């Protein structure tokens, strides 16, 4: 590889197929193309709608987990050997698809994220390869199927993000990251103003990653 790297980090969405992966090989290949950071999207499987709930790290004492893998354990071991950095996603939750102004779902997600973070911090909070934390729930500035364009939903979303981020920062000095979807049919200036309102209420959020949906239209209305 002789060119200039255009990306220095990648996301990975873990599942059981990675249980035998050779992470030394994967991380060495990443370093060869200028990638020195992997973002683990979820510490658990995004499978709330099934009876099985998988954890990608071990051990865990969380009562809802039914199956444990040691995938992240092996990733951290290999990351240290290969000079790789890892940003760790927390609980794989989701927002309400019907009403974003009800507090119950936010409260549920706060508690789940705290519990997952506490276990992850106990395992790797002082690990040399830990580069940060990732709040997994993806939101957007549109209105499909529901959104947060108006109050009180906007501030409820911001309060949720800040609550989780502040809890993380109370124990760990590492950066807290999010990756929402940008500009789902909204004009760019309105998108910027909307995110400005979110960030004004979330001082403990450090990094916004541009999701692959950035700039996409055809969600709230068609554009020729």
Cite the ranges covered by each PLM segment.
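Glycan-processing catalytic domains of CAZymes
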Residues: 1-224
């Amino acid at each position: 590889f002789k060119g200039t790297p255009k990306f220095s980090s990648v996301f990975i969405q873990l599942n059981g197929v990675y249980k035998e992966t050779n992470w030394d090989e994967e991380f060495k290949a990443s370093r060869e193309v200028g990638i020195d950071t992997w973002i683990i999207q979820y510490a658990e499987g995004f499978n709330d709608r099934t009876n099985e709930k998988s954890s990608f790290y071990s051990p865990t004492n969380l009562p809802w987990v039914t199956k444990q893998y040691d995938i992240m354990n092996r990733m951290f071991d290999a990351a240290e050997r290969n000079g790789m950095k890892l940003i760790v996603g927390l609980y794989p939750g989701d927002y309400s698809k019907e009403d974003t102004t009800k507090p119950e779902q936010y409260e549920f997600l706060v508690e789940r994220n705290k519990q997952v973070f506490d276990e992850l911090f106990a395992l790797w909070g002082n690990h040399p390869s830990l580069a940060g934390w990732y709040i997994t729930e993806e939101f957007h500035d549109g209105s499909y199927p529901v959104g947060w364009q108006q109050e009180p939903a906007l501030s409820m979303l911001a309060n949720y993000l800040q609550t989780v981020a502040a809890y993380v920062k109370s124990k760990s000095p590492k950066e807290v990251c999010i990756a929402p979807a940008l500009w789902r049919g909204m004009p760019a200036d309105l998108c910027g103003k909307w995110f400005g309102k979110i960030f004004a209420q979330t001082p403990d959020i450090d990094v916004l990653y541009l999701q692959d949906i950035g700039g996409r239209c055809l969600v709230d209305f068609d554009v020729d």
